[in-house]
Protein backbone atom coordinates (compact mmCIF):
# COMPACT_ATOMS: atom_id res chain seq x y z
CA UNK A 1 0.00 0.00 0.00
CA UNK A 2 1.22 3.49 -0.73
CA UNK A 3 2.54 5.26 2.33
CA UNK A 4 1.44 8.86 1.83
CA UNK A 5 -0.35 11.35 3.96
CA UNK A 6 -4.04 11.78 3.21
CA UNK A 7 -5.34 14.70 1.19
CA UNK A 8 -6.07 17.57 3.53
CA UNK A 9 -9.62 18.26 2.32
CA UNK A 10 -11.88 18.18 -0.67
CA UNK A 11 -11.15 21.20 -2.83
CA UNK A 12 -12.56 22.37 -6.10
CA UNK A 13 -10.56 24.60 -8.41
CA UNK A 14 -11.19 28.29 -7.79
CA UNK A 15 -12.42 30.64 -10.48
CA UNK A 16 -8.95 32.21 -10.67
CA UNK A 17 -7.33 28.79 -11.10
CA UNK A 18 -9.77 27.91 -13.90
CA UNK A 19 -9.10 31.25 -15.59
CA UNK A 20 -5.35 30.64 -15.51
CA UNK A 21 -5.81 27.06 -16.72
CA UNK A 22 -8.02 28.14 -19.64
CA UNK A 23 -5.52 30.80 -20.68
CA UNK A 24 -2.70 28.26 -20.48
CA UNK A 25 -4.71 25.77 -22.54
CA UNK A 26 -5.72 28.22 -25.26
CA UNK A 27 -2.65 27.58 -27.46
CA UNK A 28 -3.80 23.98 -27.98
CA UNK A 29 -7.03 24.65 -29.88
CA UNK A 30 -5.77 27.87 -31.46
CA UNK A 31 -2.70 26.31 -33.04
CA UNK A 32 -4.56 23.13 -34.01
CA UNK A 33 -7.27 25.16 -35.74
CA UNK A 34 -4.75 27.31 -37.61
CA UNK A 35 -2.84 24.18 -38.66
CA UNK A 36 -6.01 22.41 -39.77
CA UNK A 37 -8.06 25.22 -41.29
CA UNK A 38 -5.86 28.30 -41.55
CA UNK A 39 -3.94 29.64 -44.53
CA UNK A 40 -1.47 27.12 -45.95
CA UNK A 41 1.51 29.39 -45.35
CA UNK A 42 0.76 29.30 -41.59
CA UNK A 43 0.50 25.50 -41.28
CA UNK A 44 4.20 24.80 -40.53
CA UNK A 45 4.41 27.50 -37.85
CA UNK A 46 1.13 26.44 -36.27
CA UNK A 47 2.21 22.80 -36.05
CA UNK A 48 5.59 23.76 -34.62
CA UNK A 49 3.84 25.92 -32.02
CA UNK A 50 1.46 23.10 -31.11
CA UNK A 51 4.32 20.64 -30.65
CA UNK A 52 6.45 23.05 -28.62
CA UNK A 53 3.47 23.92 -26.40
CA UNK A 54 2.80 20.20 -25.90
CA UNK A 55 6.40 19.77 -24.77
CA UNK A 56 6.17 22.70 -22.36
CA UNK A 57 2.89 21.51 -20.83
CA UNK A 58 4.03 17.89 -20.44
CA UNK A 59 7.21 19.15 -18.76
CA UNK A 60 5.16 21.41 -16.49
CA UNK A 61 2.81 18.59 -15.50
CA UNK A 62 5.78 16.38 -14.70
CA UNK A 63 7.08 19.15 -12.45
CA UNK A 64 3.72 19.47 -10.72
CA UNK A 65 3.66 15.73 -10.08
CA UNK A 66 7.24 15.91 -8.78
CA UNK A 67 6.21 18.71 -6.42
CA UNK A 68 3.20 16.78 -5.14
CA UNK A 69 5.41 13.80 -4.43
CA UNK A 70 8.22 15.73 -2.74
CA UNK A 71 5.76 17.17 -0.21
CA UNK A 72 5.47 13.71 1.27
CA UNK A 73 7.57 12.72 4.31
CA UNK A 74 9.01 9.80 2.31
CA UNK A 75 8.80 10.54 -1.42
CA UNK A 76 8.58 7.44 -3.58
CA UNK A 77 11.40 7.30 -6.09
CA UNK A 78 9.28 5.52 -8.73
CA UNK A 79 6.78 8.37 -8.82
CA UNK A 80 9.57 10.92 -8.97
CA UNK A 81 11.27 9.00 -11.76
CA UNK A 82 8.03 8.84 -13.75
CA UNK A 83 7.57 12.58 -13.29
CA UNK A 84 11.01 13.26 -14.73
CA UNK A 85 10.52 10.73 -17.52
CA UNK A 86 7.38 12.54 -18.72
CA UNK A 87 9.40 15.69 -19.32
CA UNK A 88 12.24 13.77 -20.93
CA UNK A 89 9.82 11.86 -23.17
CA UNK A 90 8.22 15.12 -24.32
CA UNK A 91 11.61 16.53 -25.31
CA UNK A 92 12.64 13.31 -27.06
CA UNK A 93 9.40 13.33 -29.06
CA UNK A 94 9.91 16.97 -30.03
CA UNK A 95 13.57 16.45 -30.97
CA UNK A 96 12.62 13.46 -33.14
CA UNK A 97 10.83 15.87 -35.46
CA UNK A 98 12.56 15.78 -38.80
CA UNK A 99 13.70 12.20 -38.23
CA UNK A 100 10.16 10.83 -37.94
CA UNK A 101 7.01 11.80 -39.83
CA UNK A 102 4.85 14.49 -38.24
CA UNK A 103 2.04 11.96 -37.83
CA UNK A 104 4.27 9.90 -35.52
CA UNK A 105 5.34 12.97 -33.58
CA UNK A 106 1.74 14.10 -33.08
CA UNK A 107 0.74 10.53 -32.15
CA UNK A 108 3.61 10.38 -29.67
CA UNK A 109 2.36 13.51 -27.93
CA UNK A 110 -1.19 12.13 -27.89
CA UNK A 111 0.08 8.95 -26.23
CA UNK A 112 2.19 10.91 -23.74
CA UNK A 113 -0.77 13.03 -22.63
CA UNK A 114 -2.97 9.94 -22.26
CA UNK A 115 -0.35 8.05 -20.22
CA UNK A 116 0.18 11.07 -18.01
CA UNK A 117 -3.58 11.46 -17.52
CA UNK A 118 -3.93 7.78 -16.56
CA UNK A 119 -1.06 8.08 -14.11
CA UNK A 120 -2.54 11.23 -12.56
CA UNK A 121 -5.86 9.50 -11.98
CA UNK A 122 -4.24 6.55 -10.25
CA UNK A 123 -2.08 8.61 -7.92
CA UNK A 124 -3.48 8.32 -4.41
CA UNK A 125 -4.07 11.22 -2.06
CA UNK A 126 -3.56 14.12 -4.41
CA UNK A 127 -5.53 17.31 -3.85
CA UNK A 128 -9.03 16.69 -5.15
CA UNK A 129 -8.75 19.56 -7.63
CA UNK A 130 -5.76 18.00 -9.40
CA UNK A 131 -7.56 15.21 -11.32
CA UNK A 132 -10.16 17.71 -12.55
CA UNK A 133 -7.49 20.08 -13.84
CA UNK A 134 -5.49 17.17 -15.26
CA UNK A 135 -8.54 16.04 -17.21
CA UNK A 136 -9.04 19.55 -18.61
CA UNK A 137 -5.41 19.72 -19.72
CA UNK A 138 -5.31 16.23 -21.20
CA UNK A 139 -8.68 16.68 -22.89
CA UNK A 140 -7.74 19.98 -24.47
CA UNK A 141 -4.36 18.68 -25.59
CA UNK A 142 -5.68 15.38 -26.96
CA UNK A 143 -8.60 16.85 -28.89
CA UNK A 144 -6.29 19.48 -30.40
CA UNK A 145 -3.60 16.94 -31.22
CA UNK A 146 -6.20 14.61 -32.74
CA UNK A 147 -7.41 17.42 -34.99
CA UNK A 148 -3.82 18.10 -36.05
CA UNK A 149 -3.20 14.39 -36.57
CA UNK A 150 -6.21 14.13 -38.87
CA UNK A 151 -4.90 17.06 -40.91
CA UNK A 152 -1.36 15.65 -41.02
CA UNK A 153 -2.65 12.25 -42.15
CA UNK A 154 -4.69 13.77 -44.96
CA UNK A 155 -1.90 16.05 -46.20
Spans of model-derived segments:
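C-terminal ends of transmembrane helices
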Residues: 3-7, 61-73, 116-129
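Membrane-interface helix termini and inter-helical loops of multi-pass transporters
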Residues: 36-46, 154-155
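Structural signature of hydrophobic alpha-helical transmembrane segments
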Residues: 43-57, 101-111
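Membrane-helix boundary connector in multi-pass membrane proteins
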Residues: 97-108, 117-132
